[in-house]
C-alpha cells in the first residue's frame, strides 16, 4: 500500500475505534457481532462443530483436558485488522457458547466441548489470532486491549505466510484500502485452508439511490467535519468517503471473489446497504 495512506492511518490510530463507533452510531459493533455469529453457524454446518452434535452439559460425560483426541484448532487471521476489534469480537462470540445452544465455553482456554453422534467428545480450540495490518500505528493499539494475538505488519497482497495457514480470515473495512482487491483475494485464498472462510465486512460502492445520495451528498458534508473535530485529521475522513465511492459494488466484488476460486455463501446487507458482510468459502476440494 502507498506510504501516504499508511501515514494517514498511523495518524488516526489512537482515535480510530472511537470514531468508527461514533460515526456509525455503534452499528459497526453490531455488524462485527453478526459476522462472527454467522461464521460460527457456517462452521457448524460444514463440520467444524456439527450442528447435530450435542453440547457438553453437567449431565454429559466429562473429558480430561489432555484427552480430547478430536480437537479442532481454529487458526484466525484478522487481515487489515487495525486495532484488532474484529479478532476480539470473534473470540468473545466464540467463547460465549456453542453454535446450537447457550452452553458456555472455557474462557481460560478458549475452548468448547461437543459430543459427536457416537458419544465421543470433541473440542473446538481458538488459537491466538494473527492481526495483520500495514500500519504500525494501528497495530500499536492492539496491545492495550490485551487481545490474545500476535500483531504482524504486512502487505495484504503478499503475506509472509505459507499456504493453507488459516481456517478463518476476517477483513473488516480493509479491502477498499488495498490497491489491488483481486490480488488481496487471491492471497487470502492462498493462505486459507481448504474448507476455510473469509469474511469481508465493508462499505461497498453504493448501488441504490438512497445510498448514492448518502455517500455522495450527505457523507462528504459531515464525516470529514466530525473526523477533523475529534482527530484533527480531516483528510483521512475525506479519503474514507472517496474510497467508498471509488470501490467496487458488492455484486462486482462477489463476482471477483468467485473468479478467484471462492464460493459466496451469503451476502448480508446492513442498515439498508450502508455496509455489507460477505461470507466466502474456500471449497474443501481446493488443492
Model-derived regions, located:
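N-terminal, positively charged/glycine-rich alpha-helical extensions of SAM-dependent methyltransferases
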Residues: 1-17, 219
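Hydrophobic beta-strand segment of the Class I
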Residues: 16, 169-170
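Conserved alpha-helix/loop element of class I SAM-dependent methyltransferases that forms part
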Residues: 25-48, 55, 67-72, 89
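Class I SAM-dependent methyltransferase SAM/SAH-binding core
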Residues: 75-107, 119, 123-158
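A short acidic, Gly/Pro-enriched loop at the edge of an enzyme's catalytic core
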Residues: 157-169
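A short glycine-rich, Lys/Arg-flanked "PGG" loop and its adjoining helix->strand segment in the class I
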Residues: 182-197
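C-terminal alpha-helical "lid/dimerization" subdomain adjacent to the S-adenosyl-L-methionine
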Residues: 204-260, 266
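Core SAM-dependent methyltransferase catalytic element
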Residues: 261-287
Amino acid at each position: 500500500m502507498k506510504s501516504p495512506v499508511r501515514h494517514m492511518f498511523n495518524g488516526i490510530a489512537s482515535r480510530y475505534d472511537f470514531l468508527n463507533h461514533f460515526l456509525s452510531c455503534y452499528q459497526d459493533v453490531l455488524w462485527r457481532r453478526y459476522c462472527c455469529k454467522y461464521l460460527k453457524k457456517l462452521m457448524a454446518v460444514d463440520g467444524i462443530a456439527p450442528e447435530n452434535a450435542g453440547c457438553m452439559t453437567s449431565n454429559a460425560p466429562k473429558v480430561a483436558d489432555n484427552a480430547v483426541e478430536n480437537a479442532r484448532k481454529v487458526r484466525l487471521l484478522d487481515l487489515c485488522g487495525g486495532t484488532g476489534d474484529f479478532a476480539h469480537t470473534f473470540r468473545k462470540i466464540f467463547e460465549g457458547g456453542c453454535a446450537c445452544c447457550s452452553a458456555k465455553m472455557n474462557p481460560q482456554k478458549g475452548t468448547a466441548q461437543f459430543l459427536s453422534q457416537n458419544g465421543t467428545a470433541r473440542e473446538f480450540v481458538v488459537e491466538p489470532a494473527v492481526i495483520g495490518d500495514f500500519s504500525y500505528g494501528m497495530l500499536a493499539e492492539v496491545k492495550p486491549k490485551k487481545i490474545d494475538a500476535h500483531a504482524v505488519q504486512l502487505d495484504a497482497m503478499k503475506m509472509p505466510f505459507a499456504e493453507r495457514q488459516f481456517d478463518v480470515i476476517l477483513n473488516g473495512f480493509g479491502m477498499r484500502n488495498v490497491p489491488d482487491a483481486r490480488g488481496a483475494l487471491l492471497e487470502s485464498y492462498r493462505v486459507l485452508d481448504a474448507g476455510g472462510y473469509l469474511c469481508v465486512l465493508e462499505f461497498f460502492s453504493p448501488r441504490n439511490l438512497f445510498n448514492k445520495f448518502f455517500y455522495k451528498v450527505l457523507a462528504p458534508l459531515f464525516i470529514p467535519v466530525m473526523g477533523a473535530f475529534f482527530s484533527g485529521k480531516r483528510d483521512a475522513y475525506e479519503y474514507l468517503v472517496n474510497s467508498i465511492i471509488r470501490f467496487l459494488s458488492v455484486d462486482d466484488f462477489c463476482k471477483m471473489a468467485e473468479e478467484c476460486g471462492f464460493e459466496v455463501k451469503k451476502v448480508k446487507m446492513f442498515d439498508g446497504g450502508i455496509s455489507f458482510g460477505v461470507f466466502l468459502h474456500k471449497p474443501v476440494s481446493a488443492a
